[in-house]
């Protein structure tokens, strides 16, 4: 079994293809990352699944804003889970909270069961909960396969101490995946401080080296491939050093 997982969050097919070319273990496919992400369209989901050989996980979020959903919104989520499973996705990322901010275990468990055999990541709705320790137990009880979190902080580096506590609390019951403000410059520090084996990021940045037609610049896709390779290389180096 591989020592680590690097998941890239993308919202276009070229970015998804760049993720695979760069060595990402899987992608999370989203739309509207500018508002925190919502469920992408079926055409993009289908095209991405067909184009990639690595696992495609799909964000399920019907709207921006909070994660306490009405009955109609929850039914929409259920339908999206069912349809994405039909399309052949390997997994979904979702999160449902109660109006008081706690994890909605009943609805979450229902979605996990509906999604099977797809893998289910409980996403960063988790970071909105008032008690992260109890929320972790709720996510485990709901049957999720992975938890994506920044440790309740704006970014994974500032949440590193909490992430380490969560890794210890979770043990081998659920993988903790750090995501939120992940930067190449801080990846090694995050891994060292937390004991994590799974990282999630978008690694987005502007292609500033010049336009592709100049012959001196790189396209956004080429930059992303290079960044993913750097991220994967950093993780490989970290875990190789741990084995010495």
Model-derived features: positions:
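Glycine-rich phosphate-binding active-site loops on the catalytic face of alpha/beta enzymes
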Residues: 26-38, 83-99, 144-159, 183, ...
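N-terminal amphipathic alpha-helix/helix-capping segment at the start of soluble metabolic enzymes
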Residues: 1-9, 13, 49-50, 239, ...
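A short, Lys/Arg-enriched amphipathic alpha-helix followed by its capping loop at the start of a domain
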Residues: 2-6, 18-25
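Hydrophobic, well-structured mid-protein blocks that either form specific transmembrane helices
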Residues: 85-142
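Alpha-helix-loop-beta-strand connector modules within alpha/beta enzyme cores
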Residues: 37-64, 103-125, 158-184, 219-243
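Active-site beta->alpha loop and helix N-cap motifs at the rims of alpha/beta catalytic domains
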Residues: 13-15, 24-26, 38-39, 45-105
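Catalytic cores of alpha/beta
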Residues: 11-21, 68-81, 127-142, 163-178, ...
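Hydrophobic faces of well-ordered beta-strands that scaffold small-molecule active sites
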Residues: 4-10, 27-29, 56-60, 92-94, ...
């Amino acid at each position: 079994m591989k020592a680590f997982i690097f998941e890239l969050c993308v919202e276009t097919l070229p970015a998804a293809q760049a993720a695979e070319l760069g060595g990402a273990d899987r992608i999370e496919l989203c739309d509207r990352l500018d508002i925190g992400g919502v469920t992408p369209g079926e055409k993009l989901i289908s095209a991405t699944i067909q184009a990639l050989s690595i696992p495609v996980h799909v964000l399920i979020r019907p709207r921006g804003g909070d994660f306490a959903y009405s009955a109609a919104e929850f039914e929409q989520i259920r339908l999206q889970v069912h349809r994405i499973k039909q399309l052949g996705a390997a997994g979904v990322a979702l999160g449902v909270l109660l109006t008081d901010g706690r994890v909605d275990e009943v609805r979450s468990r229902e979605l996990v069961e509906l999604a099977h055999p797809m893998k289910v990541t409980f996403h960063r709705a988790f970071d909105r909960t008032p008690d992260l320790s109890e929320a972790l137990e709720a996510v485990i009880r709901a049957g999720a396969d992975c938890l994506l979190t920044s440790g309740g902080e704006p970014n994974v580096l500032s949440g590193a101490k909490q992430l380490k506590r969560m890794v210890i609390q979770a043990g081998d019951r659920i993988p903790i995946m750090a995501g939120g403000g992940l930067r190449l410059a801080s990846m090694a520090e995050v891994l060292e401080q937390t004991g994590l084996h799974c990282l999630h990021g978008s690694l987005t940045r502007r292609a500033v080296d010049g336009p592709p037609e100049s012959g001196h610049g790189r396209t956004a896709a080429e930059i992303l491939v290079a960044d993913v390779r750097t991220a994967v290389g950093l993780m490989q180096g970290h875990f190789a050093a741990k084995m010495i």
